[in-house]
């Protein structure tokens, strides 16, 4: 399971150190793709396979299904860690997520997310006040 928040940097070649606690969960290969909210989603191959199966079931006759699967799959890239525990973030994905030097890597249960430091800080500050309301609307059990 992916848990926690980590601050990292991306070098000029687009390489980023993956938190040590996440490396064993990622395995090799793994998949990185465009996520929602201008972040990147990173999935272990087993989780990607499950997600792919679910998305393949969407009716291609529906415009939204076609748009989402195009967005999601066209940005996907299979990756492996190098010997230093780094992954290479492809340039188009760095541009999509507005990744420059500083980034934030967060664990979200079955996936890892990579955020621009600025976008993450903005997201957290905007979401803090509404977190209780979101929980009330979505969760039917005590936290």
Curated annotation (Swiss-Prot):
SUPFAM superfamilies: AbrB/MazE/MraZ-like. It holds the Pfam family MraZ. Keywords: Cytoplasm, DNA-binding, Repeat, Transcription, Transcription regulation. GO terms for cellular component: cytoplasm; nucleoid. Its main location: cytoplasm. InterPro entries: MraZ (IPR003444), MraZ_C (IPR035644), MraZ_dom (IPR020603), MraZ_N (IPR035642), MraZ_sf (IPR038619), SpoVT-AbrB_dom (IPR007159), SpoVT-AbrB_sf (IPR037914). It is found in: Cytoplasm, Nucleoid. GO terms for molecular function: DNA-binding transcription factor activity; transcription cis-regulatory region binding. The keyword Transcription regulation applies. Residues 5-47, 76-119 form the SpoVT-AbrB domain. One of its GO terms (biological process) is negative regulation of DNA-templated transcription initiation. CDD domains: MraZ_C (cd16321), MraZ_N (cd16320). Gene3D superfamilies: Transcriptional regulator MraZ domain. NCBIfam families: division/cell wall cluster transcriptional repressor MraZ (TIGR00242). Belongs to the MraZ family. Forms oligomers. This is Transcriptional regulator MraZ. It comes from Shouchella clausii (strain KSM-K16). The gene is mraZ.
């Amino acid at each position: 399971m992916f848990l926690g928040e980590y601050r990292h940097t991306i070098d000029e070649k687009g390489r980023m150190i993956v938190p040590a606690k996440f490396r064993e969960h990622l395995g090799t290969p793994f998949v990185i793709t465009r996520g929602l909210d201008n972040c990147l989603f990173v999935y272990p191959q087993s989780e990607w396979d499950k997600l792919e199966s679910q998305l393949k079931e969407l009716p291609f006759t529906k415009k939204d299904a076609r748009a989402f699967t195009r967005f999601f799959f066209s940005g996907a890239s299979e990756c492996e860690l190098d010997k230093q525990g780094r992954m290479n973030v492809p340039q188009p994905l760095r541009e999509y997520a507005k990744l420059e030097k500083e980034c934030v890597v967060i664990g979200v249960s079955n996936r890892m997310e990579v955020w621009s430091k600025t976008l993450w800080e903005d997201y957290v500050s905007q979401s803090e006040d509404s977190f209780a309301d979101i929980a009330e609307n979505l969760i039917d059990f005590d936290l």
